[in-house]
């Protein structure tokens, strides 16, 4: 899988999402639960806004000094016996991982949940050279078995219910028991445990890399990442270049913010800080590789969208977004959905495929208020729209013509006067009472679901003339 998860056009994807009543119900229920849990966890911590401020300061400081911390990380990982590779593009990253697998003559690879490995199409790259890649995260495993893309950053199978999951297991894996979550989890665990022992390479993502220790931090609730890091003899960790913290002190703050914002917990079940195996340690990989992925991030770092790199992938913005609630994750056409996806995906994937995403927002600002590191998401969405129109010239033709006509009319007193006189008569065939009932052209999408007031028969300038001081009416 790559960052792009659908070849359908944006409107078709949105239409599919709106028509999927189960998905909408599941998303609504999950959003409510996760939102409520996040508020409760934040209240328990106390001084939440101060913690958000601290999180923002840590992320901004790290980005301002990213080159220094990346080199410090590289030096410390190397000192501990690991190998570090800086990948400029997603192709570079995938090629390096292929080369490691070829060198090890690996046939089986097991991996934990990682967005950046999806971004670089790692699974496809390994399958090209004959490797079997097994997802060990339960949600990702369900989707892998069903050949279905993720719909949420932290809950990838959110759009499926347990009956659908049972049917997938029955059809693809021969599962014969009920749709009880415990029974299905036990079945999957047995499947995965057997394959863990045979895997030559384990691949993980990285929630945060600690510069001054050369350590990686992984945050999970299933414990699968610990097995991926400890059983295979070779480990490959893949991280976006921005996922840095200077020291363990900053890690402590950000992990607390991440867990509370993502799932409403003080800590997840497993928070693992590890790296290359040391002489005194009894388990861990014999060989460790860290792949640091740029893939456009350095360009973002030097742009007006820089603050999006503060993201810690908690999905708090997704869990409060009213647009996501109604259309679901697949409508975004990317592994990154919700407000974070609407900002980040066009930066990584370009406007050709994703120019509609910045408009998939009501600009209510709920995402900005929810973000634990205070990314101004709705401002960045507006900035995208400005770039699309003013710099890229990608506004729809109808919109360009409409704005040109408005500009001509608004800048000419004679044209404006004539237009305001003609508007009521021109709109009368589409008017019922004092409302436009049937929109024309661009207005149709609006009037299909909203009321639109009909032009007043009495112009304001006429009303004012009749009611101004000294008037007769």
Swiss-Prot record:
Region forming the signal peptide: none
Binding-site positions, [4Fe-4S] cluster 2: 321, 364, 367
Family recorded in the similarity comment: Belongs to the LutB/YkgF family.
PROSITE patterns per the UniProt record, alphabetical: 4FE4S_FER_1
Domain of life: Bacteria
Pfam families: Fer4_8, LUD_dom, LutB_C
GTP-binding recorded as keyword: no
Gene: lutB2
The name this protein goes by in its record: Lactate utilization protein B 2
Positions contributing to [4Fe-4S] cluster 1 binding: 311, 314, 317, 371
Gene Ontology molecular-function annotations: 4 iron, 4 sulfur cluster binding; metal ion binding
């Amino acid at each position: 899988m790559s960052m792009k998860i659908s070849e359908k056009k944006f409107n078709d994807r949105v239409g599919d999402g709106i028509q999927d009543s189960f998905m909408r119900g599941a998303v609504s229920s999950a959003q409510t639960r996760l939102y409520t849990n996040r508020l409760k966890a934040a209240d328990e911590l106390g001084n939440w806004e101060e913690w958000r401020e601290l999180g923002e300061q840590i992320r901004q400081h790290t980005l301002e000094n990213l080159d220094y911390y990346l080199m410090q990380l590289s030096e410390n990982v190397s000192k501990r016996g690991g190998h570090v590779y800086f990948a400029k593009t997603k192709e570079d990253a995938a090629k390096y991982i292929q080369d490691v697998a070829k060198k090890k003559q690996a046939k089986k690879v097991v991996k934990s949940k990682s967005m950046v490995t999806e971004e670089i199409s790692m699974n496809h790259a390994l399958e090209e050279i004959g490797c079997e890649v097994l997802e060990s995260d339960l949600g990702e495993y369900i989707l892998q078995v069903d050949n279905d893309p993720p719909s949420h950053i932290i809950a990838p199978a959110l759009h499926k219910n347990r009956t659908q999951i049972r049917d997938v297991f029955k059809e693809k894996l021969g599962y014969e028991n009920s749709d009880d979550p415990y029974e299905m989890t036990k079945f999957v665990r047995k499947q995965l445990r057997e394959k863990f022992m045979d895997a030559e390479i384990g691949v993980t993502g990285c929630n945060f890399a600690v510069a001054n220790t050369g350590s990686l931090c992984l945050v999970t609730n299933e414990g699968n990442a610990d097995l991926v890091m400890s059983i295979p003899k070779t480990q490959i960790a893949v991280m976006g270049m921005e996922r840095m913290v200077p020291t363990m002190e900053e890690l402590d703050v950000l992990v607390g913010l991440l867990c509370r914002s993502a799932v409403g917990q003080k800590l997840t079940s497993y928070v693992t800080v590890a790296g290359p195996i040391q002489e005194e340690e009894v388990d861990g990989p014999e060989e460790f590789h860290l792949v640091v992925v740029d893939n456009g991030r350095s360009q973002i770092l030097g742009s007006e969208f820089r603050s999006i790199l503060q993201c810690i992938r908690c999905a708090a913005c997704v869990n409060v977004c009213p647009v996501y609630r109604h259309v679901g994750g697949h409508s975004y056409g990317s592994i990154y959905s919700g407000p974070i996806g609407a900002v980040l995906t066009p930066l990584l994937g370009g406007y050709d495929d994703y120019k509609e995403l910045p408009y998939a927002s009501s600009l209510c600002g709920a995402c900005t208020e929810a973000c634990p590191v205070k990314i101004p998401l709705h401002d960045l969405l507006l900035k995208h729209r400005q770039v699309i129109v003013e710099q890229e010239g990608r506004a729809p033709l109808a919109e360009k013509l409409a704005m040109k006509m408005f500009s001509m009319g608004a800048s000419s007193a004679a044209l404006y006067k004539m237009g305001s006189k003609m508007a009521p008569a021109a709109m009368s065939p589409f008017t019922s009472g004092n409302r436009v009932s049937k929109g024309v052209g661009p207005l149709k999408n609006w009037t299909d679901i909203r009321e639109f007031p009909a032009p007043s028969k009495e112009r304001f300038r006429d009303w004012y003339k009749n009611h101004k001081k000294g008037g007769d009416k």
